[in-house]
From Swiss-Prot:
Source organism phylogeny: Bacteria, Pseudomonadati, Pseudomonadota, Gammaproteobacteria, Pasteurellales
Family statement drawn from the similarity comment of this UniProt entry: Belongs to the peptidase M50B family.
A single cellular component GO annotation: plasma membrane
Protein name in the entry: Putative zinc metalloprotease PM1991
Database matches in Pfam families: PDZ, Peptidase_M50
Broad enzyme group: hydrolase
Length: 442
């Protein structure tokens, strides 16, 4: 995946979602009779502009990392008496709150529309069937059996591994997780309880489900090497593409092999090449990301059709599913943010623009429907983040308006300005920390 592809995919995501967000503010302002001076996508030098009959200038600027809607406002300019009724600051608290909240609401509506489209067209996925259970894991202690399908997590129905993984991640810090299971192909329900009191995991190194010992049905892996990286530990040991790897007399599984590598210690493997057998010692090394690796890729076969499914519904059900998915993602986002503040999830998991760019590039390469799903996810995150009660964000403005409604008058300009400075400092610190984490992951 090229840098340019990821960058272009990222710019499209940000530009579309910013346009959606700002259009929410713009539409609400027009509905409330507020004069809008400018609707801008991006910052900096103006690349294109057009002014409509109502005097609003629509602008595309050079730096596509944000946007804004500039409204007539007596706090920032001298308003002619004949236009005072069209100034933002002269509108009622309820009208101003509507204009401010309309941005995040537009992001949520976009997510609903995106998921409605996805579920109408149909999106291929893999049924959440457990292929194997890692030994000595939390799932093993709960006596969960392979070849069972996860039907619900703490009562929330699930139909794919992506949703399960996100749900499990939000359970960090909980003492227990309740799973509803069914033997694959059966309607008989089983209920298992995962003891997660001491459960912790690093999302950079493993998924929530794998850290619990749940191994999903994956592409079938044959331990015939399809690739050996140049100058990798495997290359130094003499391994070549086409070699078949064994552990003693038993054919090693990819999961077992990964466990050996992650221990970071030298281990012996038996190698078959052109009908001849030999033994080599593989010594894992740390890569740039601080992970143990040996530099090989196995041969992969497609997942059996019996485990494949397509999430596709009629128009009304697709709309319902779109609403449910958006609500679910919103709640999951809030819970994850909460766990970042409580320490249940480390702040190093906070991602910034580089992480978004990577996700945009990967999803766009997989297919348009997955790219749309990624945009919906980021749109939900954008909506939630903008509702944070920081003065520089929409949520902070809503807090000021709530205070005005209670007091009968706005907070003093001094308090508001001080709050803006503090909010801006906090936001810049979070953005800087997220960007720092992004660079560490490169």
């Amino acid at each position: 995946m090229s840098f340019l592809w990821s960058f272009a995919s990222f710019i499209i995501v940000i530009s579309v979602l910013v346009a959606v967000h700002e259009y929410g503010h713009f539409w609400a302002a027009r509905k409330c009779g507020i004069q809008v001076h400018r609707f801008s996508i991006g910052f900096g030098k103006v690349l294109w502009s057009r002014t409509d009959k109502q005097g609003t200038e629509f602008v595309i600027s050079a730096i596509p990392l944000g946007g804004y809607v500039k409204m007539l406002d007596g706090r920032n300019e001298v308003v002619p008496p004949e236009l005072s009724s069209r100034a933002f600051d002269q509108k009622s608290v309820l009208q101003r709150a509507f204009v401010i909240a309309a941005g995040p609401i537009a992001n949520f509506l976009f997510a609903i529309l995106a998921y409605f489209t996805i579920y109408t067209v149909g999106i291929p996925t893999v049924k959440p069937v457990i292929a194997d259970i890692s030994s000595n894991s939390i799932a093993a202690q709960a006596q969960i059996e392979p070849n069972t399908q996860i039907m619900a997590v703490d009562g929330t129905k699930v139909s794919d591994w992506e949703t399960i993984n996100m749900l499990l991640a939000t359970k960090m810090g909980n003492d227990e997780i309740h799973l509803t299971l069914s033997p694959f192909g059966s309607s008989i329900e089983q209920h298992k309880v995962l003891n997660t009191k001491d459960w912790r995991f690093d999302p950079e190194k493993e998924s929530a489900m794998s850290s619990l010992g749940l191994q999903p049905v994956r592409t079938k892996v044959d331990m015939i090497l399809s690739k050996v990286e140049v100058n990798s530990p495997a290359d130094k040991a003499g391994l070549k593409a086409g070699d078949r790897i064994y552990a003693g007399e038993q054919l090693i599984s990819w999961q077992q092999f990964v466990q050996f590598v992650q221990e970071g210690k030298p281990f012996n493997v038996k190698v078959e090449r052109d009908g001849q057998f030999s033994f080599v010692v593989l010594t894992p090394e740390l890569n740039k990301k601080g992970r143990w690796y040996v530099g090989i890729a196995p041969t992969a076969a497609p997942i059996s059709d019996i485990y494949r499914t397509e999430l596709k519904y009629g128009i009304l059900e697709a709309l319902q599913k779109g609403v449910e998915k958006t609500i679910q993602l919103s709640w999951l986002t809030i819970k994850v943010i909460g766990k970042l503040f409580t320490g249940d999830l480390a702040l190093k998991n906070l991602g910034g623009p580089i992480s978004i760019a990577k996700g945009a590039g990967i999803s766009s390469e997989i297919g348009l429907i997955y790219y749309l799903g990624f945009m919906a996810l980021i749109s939900v995150n954008l909506g939630i983040m903008n509702l944070f009660p920081l003065p520089v964000l929409d949520g902070g403005h809503l807090v000021f308006l709530a205070a005005e409604a209670v007091r009968g008058k706005p907070l003093s300009e001094r308090i508001q300005n001080l709050s803006y400075r503090i909010g801006a400092a906090i936001l810049m610190a979070l953005m800087g920390f997220a960007l720092f984490n992004d660079f560490l992951r490169l």
